[in-house]
Amino acid sequence: TRTEPAAPQGGEKVRTNNIAMIVPQRFITLDLPFLRKCMGGICIMADQRGYDLMLCYASNTEYSQLQRQLANHKVDGVILTYAMADDPCIELLRQYETPFVLIGRSEDKTIPQADNDQVAAACEMTRILLQLGAKRIALLVGSTIYAVNTDRIRGYLRGFAEFGVPVDQRLVHSGVESAGQTLDALEAALEQKADCILCGDDEVAFEVMGELRTRHILVPNDLRVASLYDSSMLASITLSVSAVQYDAEQLGKTA
């Protein structure tokens, strides 16, 4: 005779052996090496512990997929691959009392976090570029609703402050989330006589390098380009871009 598993008693939860990895909705159409490597690290550790990985897309306004997974008890835990101000997903996870960890930095120290020091990295890169002779460094980063981008701006400003050089705020461009916005920010930076473009990540740097080639602007002879995240995407096109290196796979394993 076949014995059916007993139903959970009271508030007891049924173990699913599934972990959800939440990815920002806007990343669906992007090929981001950071996320791929991070996912690889998560998969390795999940497999070692007998868990499977489920993907879940969410944004600050759309999180129905996560809500459905939680309501139907599909996952035992969740990994958020980004840190965002006032993230509704965090409140939802707390309502369902689901364990979760954040890849990124949050001011809420009750949230388990795995992160790289973005402020220190951006500060150090800015100082190095200033030491190399750059004077007008334009910064191109994504939306400041994400902590990683506010941290990169803070590090950039700190780098100038530590070097004793004033910052031209016209060279700071945030909200760069698409190829079109990248080209607009680059155009504005060139109009402001930037001698270096510091990109928030490899995707922005890739777009910048492509446009500079189109304009026959030589890197680094005519203009320096640097990125606050390195990847195979950049290595495949040029060796002339200075970039910060992080071990995204290890970050995923830690989470």
Which positions does each model-derived feature cover?
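Short acidic capping loops at alpha-helix termini that bridge into adjacent secondary structure
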Residues: 135-137, 167-171, 219-225
